[in-house]
Swiss-Prot record:
Assembly description: The PsaA/B heterodimer binds the P700 chlorophyll special pair and subsequent electron acceptors. PSI consists of a core antenna complex that captures photons, and an electron transfer chain that converts photonic excitation into a charge separation. The eukaryotic PSI reaction center is composed of at least 11 subunits.
Binding site residues for phylloquinone: 671
One term of GO molecular function: 4 iron, 4 sulfur cluster binding
Family assignment from sequence similarity: Belongs to the PsaA/PsaB family.
Protein name per its UniProtKB record: Photosystem I P700 chlorophyll a apoprotein A2
SUPFAM superfamilies reported for this sequence: Photosystem I subunits PsaA/PsaB (SSF81558)
Length: 734
């Protein structure tokens, strides 16, 4: 009996119902709530779990390399990146017989395979890998790192190797090590790889461990570095006629500032990328010496925060008390980390397509679409998580005495103003944007398209012009040949940049019009409403006028009984739960917009987007319906095709999504009655009644059922769109 799950909570382990199992799973990672937890054990558990996380990541990436080397066509793809379809892995057991085998035998493979839409082929090719042996070597190395991570995780749980709490709370040392060690040294190492391996490979020179010390990355070696003639490293760059992967048209420069794209690969110049990473390395190596540790140089973060007195006393005691508040709250730190990571992930989505870094990836349209969508969804989940942990911080870790009249306390003091401002912005955006869309929709329906309200995004066009786009005729900053910025940049990066920004075949600063204006504001509505729900959830987490003692009920509670009317749905968890729906909705609009605009760009019929995106029926008919037709036709009387698997996933995604509503709309009593009826029938059915249960079956709690519903809704939603996106893009462009 003593070993019943969950071992971390004796109270739960003794629960006689199935609640024991579900609550056990729900709180397994909430180390703070476990029975014998101390602050020291909490930090050590989290630290050790990080090594486990690293081991999983290394194992996964090792698996990617291994399967491509074993079952892929990397070497064939390298010979002709634009026409050979990259293979992710084989399909062991294609269902539906011979037609399936034929439909999925592609990319020059001998049997059925999956095509890779992740961009790994382009990435490995760009960084200098050329053979299957290279891939196997990488897979083995990552497997080795995975094993090392597991050993390190285990080691740091042994008494002799457990770090102390003071080690975890040494913020200055940790920041210095992460800035210099993690970002600085790794960026420098990456620059080294690019200069020593990737750039030579792009010029047809194969550098490996056997000749690594014999091949000079630059004809002048380290001479220019030590004599201060750094500009020599930028001389003689690759020419515009350079044939990637060969010496034809190649130069000798290793660190350049050419700007724009390599004409053949449509990706950033590798020598520009190396230069960028060297600059990043320099910045972070300097930044990693900024904070004072036992060497006595640099700043103390606490002193910095305490010394900052806001002008005019308008922010009270400013940042006083923040150092200890943040340093003693894991949730605050996690919230900050997630917020940063969420922003970065979304920026990755935006930059991977507009400024592609990997050779030939810009011409692989399905991969471009998949990577953009993938990173935006990931960003959405990470950002909502940031606010969730911010709310938990306010409930579990916030100390009003420690933070009296500082910026945190003042945020809480004027939360009504913050929430109501977000509210009116959301209402304004929502009603005006919907009003314009509906008006335009009605005009089209009545056959008078000329009566649409179409607004040119002149401010955004002005910003694009300032960056050098000439098609709007604004003649300002970089689009004006007389401006000082234009004259200053003319000798270095500007020609390449201007060439790229005014080229019609890439995704850099696409031309925008009234359709873009409308969908931009629809997305702004989604972002502001999601933010409103998340911010309100965090700021009201400790209490509100309606429920001043809210913090005593914890992060997720359904209600405080029937005696206090109106305490349902107002826990901080409920805000997170609601916000995730809005987040998914918003990213839906973002990805619809991105995908439709790009499909028309790639097909050369941008007028379809421009004309149809100004009214709702245009989006429904000319984007969603038109592009899902192949999916709806995945199985037909003529057998299968290579899109059939996506057609099935499209259906299955809808099924999972719809299942979510079963949990979201019906609550506990319904399920409890159903369970009791099923249990009654089970106990009276021959054979079935031989199987008994130790735990009395009970329905999920309200909060848990919502989580199950939300999980189905999210997973189904994303599966459905993933199938739609990949099938509609690959069906058109291969």
């Amino acid at each position: 009996m003593a070993l019943r799950f969950p071992r971390f909570s004796q109270g739960l382990a003794q629960d006689p119902t199935t609640r024991r199992i579900w609550f056990g799973i729900a709180t397994a990672h909430d180390f703070e709530s476990h029975d014998d937890i101390t602050e020291e054990r909490l930090y050590q558990n989290i630290f050790a779990s990080h090594f486990g996380q690293l081991a999983i990541i290394f194992l996964w990436t090792s698996g990617n390399l291994f399967h491509v080397a074993w079952q892929g066509n990397f070497e064939a793809w390298v010979q002709d990146p634009l026409h050979v379809r990259p293979i992710a892995h084989a399909i062991w057991d294609p269902h539906f017989g011979q037609p399936a085998v034929e439909a999925f035998t592609r990319g020059g493979a001998l049997g059925p395979v999956n095509i890779a839409y992740s961009g790994v082929y382009q990435w490995w090719y760009t960084i200098g890998l050329r053979t299957n042996e290279d891939l196997y070597t990488g897979a083995l190395f990552l497997l080795f790192l995975s094993a090392i991570s597991l050993i390190a995780g285990w080691l740091h749980l042994q008494p002799k190797w457990k770090p102390s709490v003071s080690w975890f709370k040494n913020a200055e040392s940790r920041l210095n090590h992460h800035l210099s060690g993690l970002f600085g040294v790794s960026s420098l190492a990456w620059t080294g790889h690019l200069v020593h391996v990737a750039i030579p490979a792009s010029r047809g020179e194969y550098v490996r461990w056997n000749n690594f010390l014999d091949v000079l990355p630059h004809p002048r070696g380290l001479g220019p570095l030590f004599t201060g003639q750094w500009n020599l490293y930028a001389q003689n760059p690759d020419s515009n006629s350079h044939f990637f992967g060969t010496s034809q048209g190649s130069g000798t420069a290793i660190l350049t500032l050419l700007g724009g794209f390599h004409p053949q690969t449509q990706s950033l110049w590798l020598t520009d990328i190396a230069h960028h990473h060297l600059a990043i390395a320099f910045l972070f190596l300097v930044a990693g010496h900024m904070y004072r540790t036992n060497f006595g140089i640099g700043h103390s973060i606490k002193d910095l925060l305490e010394a900052h007195i806001p002008p005019g006393g308008r922010l009270g005691r400013g940042h006083k008390g923040l150092y200890d508040t943040i340093n003693n709250s894991i949730h605050f730190q996690l919230g900050l980390a997630l917020a940063s990571l969420g922003v970065i992930t979304s920026l990755v989505a935006q930059h991977m397509y507009s400024l592609p870094a990997y050779a030939f990836i810009a011409q692989d349209f399905t991969t471009q679409a998949a990577l953009y969508t993938h990173h935006q969804y990931i960003a959405g989940f990470i950002m909502t998580g940031a606010f969730a942990h911010g709310a938990i911080f306010f409930i579990r870790d916030y100390n009003p005495e420690q933070n009296e009249d500082n910026v945190l306390a003042r945020m809480l003091d004027h939360k009504e103003a913050i929430i109501s401002h977000l509210s009116w912005v959301s209402l304004f955006l929502g009603f005006h944007t919907l009003g314009l869309y509906v008006h335009n929709d009605v005009m089209l329906a009545f056959g008078t398209p000329e009566k649409q309200i179409l607004i040119e995004p002149i401010f955004a066009q002005w910003i694009q012009s300032a960056h050098g786009k000439t098609s709007y005729g604004f003649d300002v900053l970089l689009s004006s040949t007389n401006s000082p910025a234009f004259i200053a940049g003319r000798s270095i990066w500007l020609p390449g940049w201007l060439n790229a920004i005014n080229e019609n075949s890439n995704s850099l600063f696409l031309k925008i019009g009234p359709g873009d204006f409308l969908v931009h504001h629809a997305i702004a509505l989604g972002l502001h409403t999601t933010t409103l729900i998340l911010v309100k959830g965090a700021l009201d987490a400790r209490g509100s006028k309606l429920m001043p003692d809210k913090k005593d009920f914890g992060y997720s509670f359904p209600c405080d009984g029937p005696g206090r009317g109106g305490t349902c749905d107002i826990s901080a968890w409920d805000a997170f739960y609601l916000a995730v729906f809005w987040m998914l909705n918003t990213i839906g609009w973002v990805t619809f917009y991105w995908h439709w605009k790009h499909i028309t760009l790639w097909q050369g019929n941008v007028s379809q987007f421009n004309e149809s995106s100004t009214y709702l029926m245009g989006w429904l008919r000319d984007y969603l319906w038109l592009n899902s037709s192949q999916l709806i036709n995945g199985y037909n009387p003529f057998g299968m095709n290579s899109l059939s698997v996506w057609a099935w996933m499209f259906l299955f995604g809808h099924l999972v999504w719809a299942t979510g509503f079963m949990f979201l709309i019906s609550w506990r009593g319904y399920w409890q009655e159903l369970i009791e009826t099923l249990a009654w029938a089970h106990e009276r059915t021959p054979l079935a009644n031989l199987i008994r249960w130790r735990d009395k079956p009970v329905a999920l709690s309200i909060v848990q059922a919502r989580l199950v519903g939300l999980a189905h809704f999210s997973v189904g939603y994303i599966f459905t769109y993933a199938a739609f996106l990949i099938a509609s893009t690959s069906g058109k462009f291969g």
